[in-house]
């Protein structure tokens, strides 16, 4: 489980990225890099870290499911992820 402060920081960053997304896109298309540099650092989507939506774990993140391998395995065994079943060959 990640620290609550890290999870809160991620939520704040996501809100900031969403807030400035349109402005950032127009400035980038115009080539106005000076104005882009004036925007908050955390408004850049590159600075976001993929984290598990359940417990905030930053490593071993699976993009397709939005969770770490640990939570994925746990929920898959319980049958709580639609379309996922244990492989057998």
From Swiss-Prot:
A Gene Ontology term for the protein's cellular component: cytoplasm
rRNA-binding among keywords: yes
Pfam families, sorted: Ribosomal_S14
InterPro entries, A to Z: Ribosomal_uS14 (IPR001209), Ribosomal_uS14_bac/plastid (IPR023036), Ribosomal_uS14_sf (IPR043140)
GO biological processes: translation
Keywords: Ribonucleoprotein, Ribosomal protein, RNA-binding, rRNA-binding
Keyword flag Cytoplasm: no
GO molecular function, one term: structural constituent of ribosome
Coiled-coil boundaries: none
Domain of life of the source: Bacteria
Oligomer and partners: Part of the 30S ribosomal subunit. Contacts proteins S3 and S10.
PANTHER family attached to this UniProt entry: 30S RIBOSOMAL PROTEIN S14, SMALL RIBOSOMAL SUBUNIT PROTEIN US14M
Family to which this protein belongs: Belongs to the universal ribosomal protein uS14 family.
Record's function text: Binds 16S rRNA, required for the assembly of 30S particles and may also be responsible for determining the conformation of the 16S rRNA at the A site.
Official protein name in the record: Small ribosomal subunit protein uS14
Organism encoding this protein: Latilactobacillus sakei subsp. sakei (strain 23K)
Lineage: Bacteria, Bacillati, Bacillota, Bacilli, Lactobacillales
């Amino acid at each position: 489980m990640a620290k609550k402060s890290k999870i809160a920081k991620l939520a704040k960053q996501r809100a900031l990225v969403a807030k400035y997304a349109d402005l950032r896109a127009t400035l980038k298309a115009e080539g106005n890099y000076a104005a882009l540099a004036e925007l908050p650092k955390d408004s850049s989507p590159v600075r976001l870290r993929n984290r598990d939506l359940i417990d905030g774990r930053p490593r071993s993140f699976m993009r397709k499911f939005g969770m770490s391998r640990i939570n994925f395995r746990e929920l898959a065994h319980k049958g709580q992820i639609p379309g996922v079943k244990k492989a057998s060959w």
